[in-house]
From Swiss-Prot:
Native source species: Gallus gallus
Compositional bias segments (type: Pro residues): 82-93
Family note: Belongs to the troponin T family.
Protein name: Troponin T, cardiac muscle isoforms
Region (Disordered): 1-99, 138-230, 280-302
Lineage: Eukaryota, Metazoa, Chordata, Craniata, Vertebrata
Length: 302
């Protein structure tokens, strides 16, 4: 049994109890009305009987006044008549149209049932509206979540694009710095090579001057010019480590530069030898052609 049927049964029981109580009250009111009518009729009959008795007493009194005056002693000695009270019968209540209590009860129950059904329908209608509102609210929530997810996706894509641009910019800057550093190293190498050539020129000029330095003295002189004093007494452990890394990087760069210069010197030496061989070969070929031209002139041998 559903909840609506239980509610209908409880409501019908309550309506039946109320209907029984109302019927009992109506019956009690009808009984009270009948008793009031009987009392009124009894009072009316008593009044009519009293009036008849008064009329009877007045009639003999008027006709025998002269006799009473003549015979006063006889009138006083006669007894008064006792009043006659007839048996009072309550009037019958007309039947009239009899009421069909079953029909009334049925109509009332139908009315109450219709009202209850209307209330139930209104309840379910309101509940249906609430469910529809709840469904629409859920749809709006889902739509809001989808929009938020889409916004989050767009934001993440934009963030990725921004990170990619930053990475590209960083790589470009690093390439630019590397290029500048390479150019700087190239300029340093060029300057160092120029210094070497200038050192050779100075050496030649010193030779021409008559004063000759040994290789050890040259090395000491160059090292004294290039070596800088290390001020590491006031440095902490981390700074000393950084300084050591810096010195190691400097030594590494110098070794790389030395290796490059050696390779360059070897390549130049090889090119010089190749050019010398080519020159000598060219001179040999040219000399052989000149010898042939001298031996044969105008179709005759000399």
């Amino acid at each position: 049994m559903s909840d609506s049927e239980e509610v209908v049964e409880e409501y019908e029981q309550e309506q039946e109890e109320e209907y029984v109580e109302e019927e009992e009250e109506e019956w009690l009111e009808e009984d009270d009305g009948q008793e009031d009518q009987v009392d009124e009729e009894e009072e009316e009959t008593e009044e009519t009987t009293a009036e008849e008795q008064e009329d009877e007493t007045k009639a003999p009194g008027e006709g025998g006044e002269g006799d009473r005056e003549q015979e006063p002693g006889e009138g006083e000695s006669k007894p008064k008549p006792k009043p006659f009270m007839p048996n009072l019968v309550p009037p019958k209540i007309p039947d009239g149209e009899r009421l069909d209590f079953d029909d009334i009860h049925r109509k009332r129950m139908e009315k109450d049932l219709n009202e209850l059904q209307a209330l139930i329908e209104a309840h379910f209608e309101s509940r249906k509206k609430e469910e529809e509102e709840l469904i629409s609210l859920k749809d709006r929530i889902e739509q809001r979540r989808a929009e938020r997810a889409e916004q989050q996706r767009i934001r993440s894509e934009r963030e990725k694009e921004r990170q990619a641009r930053m990475a590209e910019e960083r790589a470009r800057k690093e390439e630019e710095e590397a290029r500048k550093k390479a150019e700087k190293e190239a300029r340093k190498k060029k300057a160092f090579s120029n210094m070497l050539h200038f050192g050779g020129y100075m050496q030649k000029s010193e030779k021409k001057g008559g004063k000759k330095q040994t290789e050890r003295e040259k090395k000491k002189k160059i090292l004294s010019e290039r070596r800088k004093p290390l001020n590491i007494d006031h440095l902490s452990e981390d700074k000393l480590r950084d300084k050591a890394k810096e010195l190691w990087q400097t030594i590494r760069d110098l070794e790389a530069e030395k290796f490059d210069l050696q390779e360059k010197f070897k390549r130049q030496k090889y090119e010089i030898n190749v050019l010398r061989n080519r020159v000598s070969d060219h001179q040999k070929v040219k000399g052989s052609k000149a010898a042939r031209g001298k031996t044969m002139v105008g179709g005759r041998w000399k």
